[in-house]
């Protein structure tokens, strides 16, 4: 089916150490009733071709939840952040466009893939487009062209791992979204997860009264 944009694969970035989660795999946590893996898969499966997880663990669990999921590790051992996951992806995916999404997002905007492609088309030099929600830039939530690989490799070789700085070199465009009452756009610690669930429960109680 013609979606109005080129074939695009999805890579879920789940290769971190999860120090502030006491080592728990955030992709397997339930933020909104379903595991993050299932939530992301269900929301985006109709918008992308193949779905991958960039992770160093729990492959069998991922595949028990989503049988056709594909997995890969970072090209280098150690934990170098999302830039390494993005660079490593191009050794595995077949598509020339990849939507990257962090494993800990709470909100996935409707039509996010189409809107990122639209943002990317605004500048012929652009090799990246990223999501902004309520004015907050979510650099790891982004669309990259395969041509971005050269810059990714150069930045990693120089140990310049900042996505913000890398994206400047890629002439990155932005897709802007608004979401009312979004207190956390991502969950980075067990404390944040507890707060997020408490706020969600309070809102559900309030909405029924």
From Swiss-Prot:
Its cofactor is Mg(2+). It catalyses: Mo-molybdopterin + GTP + H(+) = Mo-molybdopterin guanine dinucleotide + diphosphate. Its EC number is 2.7.7.77. GO terms for cellular component: cytoplasm. The keyword Chloroplast does not apply. Mg(2+) binds at residue 104. Gene3D superfamilies: Spore Coat Polysaccharide Biosynthesis Protein SpsA, Chain A. GTP binds at residues 13-15, 26, 54, 74, 104. The keyword Transferase applies. One of its GO terms (biological process) is bis(molybdopterin guanine dinucleotide)molybdenum biosynthetic process. Keywords: Cytoplasm, GTP-binding, Magnesium, Metal-binding, Molybdenum cofactor biosynthesis, Nucleotide-binding, Transferase. One of its GO terms (molecular function) is metal ion binding. InterPro entries: MobA-like_NTP_Trfase, Molybde_CF_guanTrfase, Nucleotide-diphossugar_trans. It comes from the Bacteria. Belongs to the MobA family. Transfers a GMP moiety from GTP to Mo-molybdopterin (Mo-MPT) cofactor (Moco or molybdenum cofactor) to form Mo-molybdopterin guanine dinucleotide (Mo-MGD) cofactor. The N-terminal domain determines nucleotide recognition and specific binding, while the C-terminal domain determines the specific binding to the target protein. This is Molybdenum cofactor guanylyltransferase. It comes from Acinetobacter baumannii (strain ATCC 17978 / DSM 105126 / CIP 53.77 / LMG 1025 / NCDC KC755 / 5377). The lineage of its organism: Bacteria, Pseudomonadati, Pseudomonadota, Gammaproteobacteria, Moraxellales. The gene is mobA.
């Amino acid at each position: 089916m013609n979606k109005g944009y080129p074939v695009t694969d999805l890579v879920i970035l789940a290769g971190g150490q999860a120090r502030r989660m006491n080592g728990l795999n955030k992709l397997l946590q339930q933020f909104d009733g379903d595991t993050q893996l299932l939530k992301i898969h269900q929301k985006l499966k109709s918008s992308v071709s193949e779905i991958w997880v960039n992770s160093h663990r729990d492959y069998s669990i991922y595949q028990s939840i989503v049988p056709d999921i594909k997995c890969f590790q970072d090209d280098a051992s150690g934990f170098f952040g999302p830039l390494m996951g993005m660079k490593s992806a191009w050794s595995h995916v077949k598509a020339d466009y990849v939507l990257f999404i962090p494993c800990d997002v709470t909100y996935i905007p409707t039509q996010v893939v189409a809107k990122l492609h639209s943002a990317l088309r605004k500048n012929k030099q652009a090799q990246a487009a990223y999501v902004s929600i309520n004015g907050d830039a979510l650099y790891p939530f982004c669309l990259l062209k395969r041509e971005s690989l050269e810059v990714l490799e150069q930045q990693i070789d120089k140990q310049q791992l900042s996505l913000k700085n890398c994206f400047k070199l890629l002439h990155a465009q932005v897709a802007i979204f608004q979401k009312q009452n979004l207190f956390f756009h991502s969950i980075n610690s067990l404390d944040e997860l507890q707060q997020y669930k408490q706020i969600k429960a309070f809102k559900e109680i309030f909405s029924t009264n």
